[in-house]
Amino acid sequence: MIKHALFATLLFGVSAVSSPTIPPQPLPFSVGEKVGYDVSVDNGKKVGDGTMWIEGPVDVRGTSTYLLRFDSRVRIAMLTGVSHSSSWFDPVRRLSLRFLKHEKNPLTHDDVSVDMYPDQKTWKSVDGQTGNSPDALPLDELSFIYFIRTLPLTPGATYQFDRHFDASRNPVVITVVRREVIPTPMGELKTVLVEMRVRDPKHYKGDGLIRFNLTDDECRLPARIESTMPIVGKAVLTMKSENASARCAKR
């Protein structure tokens, strides 16, 4: 149950934010990708499972999209929490057209259903809320994770984006921290640690911080995700299975 987080000019620098244009590179993910996770709490105890995968192609208002999915389920004692997120991602323009989220646990119940209209830089939810997006290439909290995988991951680089469809959630700041080797149920993996800071008063009472360890290969699989969840507090998702190319992650 990832709590967000959560991308056209890209911003990068070595020790500070700057703004040269980055030429588009081939996407490191495609339809059919699937990653399974163990969910554990701060003391290492396993409390649940999660899955990220890509379906499609799916048509949204005449545009062929990748359907990005994330599901998780956690349980501590008699308390159970579930989360389901879906994002319809245009792989050509690299933006989101639709986002759905359902979260339910003993503390909260949250449903989000939003359509984004990039050409108008607007969005509309099923409950009637509307808003203006600051960028014509909007993203949501799930598609942002996939977008991060497309960035140059040079340690020390910092990126700043105003691409969350909800203007109040911007800016989103991405910092590439370092390369490191992490243990997983699949063995030790070479990764790049990336931190994502996003405004999220609803879930974090301010800025939220999510840490990703992306595999240091052409697939950039999220091998480890550290965030905060209701019920469990700080939670860590660690990759236990994946179906990527043999040249990625299997070391």
Model-derived features: positions:
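Hydrophobic h-region of N-terminal signal peptides that target proteins for export
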Residues: 9-19
